């Protein structure tokens, strides 16, 4: 029950984050602000995550029920606050800040829920479900924004999202009261100090910096990049294809690689495919070809998120799972900010923009090569 409610809430955080991304032109006219100001409604989320990720993770490890409930309440309250003035930029911005404050408490819970409520052999699947929920929320935001806006304006769009979010928030607040089925070792100190010298966690963080950074940069700049080749109009569909492929990959790959103990090999494949994918797009600009490339890219790249989170929970243990997830997602969000800005600086030349994405992935190849080849030898294999 709690995983279903959590999955819905996690999806809603992405839905609220990206509310205005597919309707930027219409929204800036309705609110009477610039398109850049509308973009800031999504841009505040990764910045807030960088600030709040670590303290949120520590609170979740220390007081899980209270912390996740607070995240659910903030998410629901932010969704409702936007309804105070759907066409008022001030009200909408205030609501986005509230949602952004709750998002780290929700997303950092993904491995903690798996560790508290599922036996070891089912935790990989639970983490995969949570990750699939995130990507489903992204896809729902991209596909539903324009139809709801056309049907009833900003009020209908924000009302529909708020209603769904409140249902999810109430569901989580109620279900999180269920006592944990599996308890960690109370002797393990809940702190953040262990992260400083943990080489393995820093390698995983570097990979998420690259992976989430590449995805955010593609979602932000693909239309502009393809516009140089006369294919800008296809960008929305191509991003949807990449995200849908990521949902499929996140649903099937993590369990397979965990069962075969091939986590490093999968992560190496993900970054290697990324290097090749954007070089291929730079070489051939056919929309159908780009769609095929981004399908493969999304399938492996987005599936890397649950693989990394699953591996981090094995390494950190149930007692520190939320802090580990917070650290990794902080790195991912920071990567989103940095790579978006790097590509922005090169956006006048599409070949340089695509080359920057491949270069970032090449750094990921070097990081992945330094991970342990297998986890069983390090006592990190899931129980059968």
Regions found by a protein language model. Give the residues of each.
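Helix-loop-helix hairpin linking two adjacent transmembrane segments in secondary transporters
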Residues: 129-177
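C-terminal transmembrane helical hairpin of 12-TM major facilitator-type secondary transporters
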Residues: 263-308
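Conserved MFS/SLC helix-loop-helix module at the cytosolic interface between two early adjacent transmembrane helices
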Residues: 51-86
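Helix-to-loop junctions at the C-terminal end of transmembrane segments
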Residues: 52-64, 249-262
């Amino acid at each position: 029950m709690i995983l279903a409610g959590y999955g819905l809430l996690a999806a809603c955080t992405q839905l609220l984050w990206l509310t205005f991304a597919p309707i930027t032109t219409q929204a800036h006219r309705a609110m009477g602000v610039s398109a850049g100001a509308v973009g800031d409604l999504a841009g505040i989320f990764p910045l807030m995550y960088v600030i709040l990720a670590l303290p949120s993770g520590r609170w979740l490890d220390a007081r899980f029920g209270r912390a996740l409930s607070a995240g659910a309440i903030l998410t629901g309250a932010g969704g409702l606050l936007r309804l105070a003035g759907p066409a008022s930029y001030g009200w909408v911005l205030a609501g986005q800040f509230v949602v952004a404050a709750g998002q780290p408490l929700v997303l950092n819970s993904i491995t903690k829920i798996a560790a508290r409520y599922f036996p070891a052999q089912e935790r990989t699947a639970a983490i995969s479900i949570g990750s699939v929920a995130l990507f489903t929320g992204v896809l729902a935001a991209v596909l539903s924004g324009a139809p709801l806006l056309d049907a009833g304006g900003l009020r209908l769009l924000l009302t529909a999202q708020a209603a769904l979010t409140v249902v999810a928030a109430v569901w989580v607040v109620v279900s999180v009261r269920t006592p944990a089925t599996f308890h960690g070792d109370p002797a393990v100190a809940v702190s953040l100090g262990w992260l400083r010298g943990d080489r393995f966690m820093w390698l995983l963080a570097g990979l998420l910096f690259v992976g989430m950074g590449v995805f955010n940069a593609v979602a932000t700049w693909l239309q502009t990049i393809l516009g140089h080749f006369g294919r800008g109009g296809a960008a929305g569909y191509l991003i949807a294809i990449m995200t849908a492929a990521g949902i499929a990959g996140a649903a099937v790959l993590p369990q397979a690689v965990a069962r075969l103990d091939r986590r490093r090999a999968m992560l190496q494949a993900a970054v290697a495919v990324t290097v090749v994918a954007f070089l291929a797009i730079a070489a051939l600009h056919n929309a159908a070809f780009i769609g095929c490339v981004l399908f493969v890219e999304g399938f492996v790249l987005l599936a890397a998120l649950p693989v990394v989170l699953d591996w981090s929970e094995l390494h950190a243990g149930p007692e520190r799972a939320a802090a580990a997830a917070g650290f990794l997602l902080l790195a991912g969000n920071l990567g989103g900010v940095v790579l978006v800005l790097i590509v922005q600086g090169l956006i006048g030349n599409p070949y340089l923009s695509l080359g920057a994405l491949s270069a970032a992935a090449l750094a990921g190849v070097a990081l992945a090569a330094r991970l342990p080849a297998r986890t069983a030898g390090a006592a990190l294999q899931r129980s059968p």
